[in-house]
Amino acid sequence: MYMKLWKRNLIVCWFGMFVTGVGMSQIAPIMPLYIKQLGISDTSSISKLSGIAFGITYIISAIFSPIWGNAADRFGRKPMLLRASLGMAAAIVLMGFAPNVYVLIALRLLQGAITGYSTACTTLIATQTDKENAGYALGTLSTASIAGSLLGPTIGGLIEDAFGLRPVFFITGALLLVAFITTLIFVEEVFVREDKKPLNAREVWHMVPEKDLTIVLSVTFFIITLALYTIEPIITVYVTQLSKSTNHIALISGLAFSASGLANIIAAPNLGKLSDKIGAHKVILIALAAAGLIYIPQAFVKSPWQLMGLRFMLGITLGGLNPTINTMVKKITPNSITGRIFGFTISAGYLGVFGGSVLGGQVAAKFGINYVFFVTSALLLLNCLWVYFRVYRKFNLN
């Protein structure tokens, strides 16, 4: 049975982006244990080094995403997919052989520099899919990275529980190698290289027809990613407070954190289709408002299961935001610079992961865990107002 090219590309890219997301986040629950195994015994040093090793990948990825986006526009998206998947597979496998914590941090830094799979995938799907299916394709694709990032800690914890610490890196590396092989065999791209002098950042920005809108969408992508990750540093402590028993705290915390990722996978393709029908500007406004409101009751839950239910609902609302932003970016960006612009929006997402983790920890330390939910809600609702005045009204008038 013949499968359309855009569908085949979508399936392979979804798997690759999911595994890439897992590869970046699976280390979160095992990091303190692995650092201890590598010879660090002081608790405060373990916490500090864990934070550096986790966050450095996202900061470096934010810097390199636009660079790889530019390379994708110049040399094609498929070569970037192959480079990123093979490079990350090697870096993650080497982490399993790290002799000390400093080599581990250096390899996490290298992993951040090598990434670019998400940028190339998003650009490939945006430029190789027809307009009728673009919203659905980008909606489906957007679930991969965020689901991989959110489910990664649970997957890492389960592998560690079953096989031990080092096999987490070997199994994740093997999955990325599978992504490399499937990309090599199945992904096809019709790419015509333009024999023009490469554009610098100022020239690219000059070519963007909707500068104001591009800024709003990038900031919104940063805020929604930040909102998902503010709970990351406090989830285990909060679940412990809510639980009557101390059994399986790590697993329950992982499930509560990952519930939004599961909901995202379910909701995003359908909300991507909805944005094609009623307009992306309407979906983005409703989703932001709903997400902002759903954060408030999370501060008042009485059990981990109530928290899990609200996190699932949050994932459904935020599932409408990623595909909508990608669809709008594609709509307002010329094909020749799509990779660069997607590189900037994906960088905003990586910064959101890092910023959310830092903000959640700082707010919880200074004001208490409940205030993490109030601050996150306020940020989403303020962003919603900004989108209403700068995006929604503009598109509605047109």
Segments and roles (model prediction):
Residues I52-W68, S258-P269:
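Central cavity-lining transmembrane alpha-helices of secondary-active solute carriers
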Residues L107-S145, T327-M328:
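Cytoplasmic helix-loop-helix junction between adjacent transmembrane helices
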Residues I30-S47, I234-L251:
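Short amphipathic helix-loop junctions that connect adjacent transmembrane helices
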Residues V168-L184, V372-F389:
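Symmetry-related core transmembrane helices of the 12-TM Major Facilitator Superfamily/SLC fold
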Residues M1-W6, E188-S218:
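Juxtamembrane intracellular "pre-TM" segments in multi-pass secondary transporters
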Residues A91, Y102-L110, I294, W305-M313:
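Paired small-residue
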Residues P79-L94, G173, K282-P297, S377:
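Structural signature of the two symmetry-related core transmembrane helices
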Residues A62-P99, S275-H281:
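Conserved MFS/SLC helix-loop-helix module at the cytosolic interface between two early adjacent transmembrane helices
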